[in-house]
């Protein structure tokens, strides 16, 4: 273990300063570095290790005791408050690895306390429920004569959020007193309806598919375990989405997981596809580069809880590129623009800009002809989650991204940001590739990626498609945090995970593929 951890550049002399500050990943979270390092240790045979975590010890010379103001300035300069914690001098490092007992399912006392209990839960859990939705839930549970659980409310909030339902784009519009026949989404879809030639699927799967070409595909042969070229029709997968809220809170992690989520959407198209190349785009407010003022930049205020435009453009593109590179997909193109302007002609002077940025992640891939479309799922099929473990990160991300910026607490904002582990996503993609290489014997009957809302969104999507019910065992979900409540397991947005449905008879065959790819 010492050889593994002490390789590379040596640390400076610990006695170089008379004061020390230790910075670690934010308490209560598991960093992606920790997940990777622990996994590498296990792969090297060090099975006794439960978890490895990394911190940085900063040494500095201080001629006198620093007052709190100066000490806080030093702390702010050396750590990212959204992703890291500064430890007190008397902090016991063993507490980094404390494992809590599993939390219980909580009920919201709607029966005894009425609507107010739901309004409090809406605020405390960051559910972003509207007044109409709160009234709807109150009436629903009153008819059932029982209290809602926190897992049910969080699930409803994610699945019914603007992020997942696109309520604005699906809303009816009245312009100048005249109801409009088209909705925004139907207007977007009308182009495909008017020109359907070459479109295999659009607006019905995790990504769109258009007709491709006959090409040589390099795939592994299960029989002799050799890679062979096979000439066959191969179609083009296309996807673009945004990841704005997480990028505003933590630019590197937000942009990285934005790219990772788009990659998973491509891989989870049809019965399994292969991501090939990516794009990234950013729209932010003016950069205000220190000591490099520009005539069009005014000193407008900026929300403290959000990263500055300069921080976003310093860390965000690197986060996206890093995930693409570590996954093994080139990020080939993108765009970048700034915009911020005063609108003095309005009754109240307004300033418009991208304090909450636009972060676009997109890409193209390919899919075999026989796997381009989803199929019907038989009864008694098994639902399986593959990829990384459940972790208490990204909780409530779908609802958080639907809130007006600044209307939730800083802790809720942070909780809604995911953390990326591209190596794990690569492994999961290798499982998909091995399955699709089997052609007509592909064991995958249905596949969805796990994104906003976690399992609470992805599994109901799969169950709804199957037209059957499902029996779920939450405690059997791979979980890195044993203290997580049922709501946490059901709704967390830990990354690099997919929901698959496979034939029960082929379970062991599928597990063998997963074990080979670790």
Regions found by a protein language model. Give the residues of each.
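Core nucleic-acid recognition elements
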Residues: 1-406, 410-424, 428-442, 451-455, ...
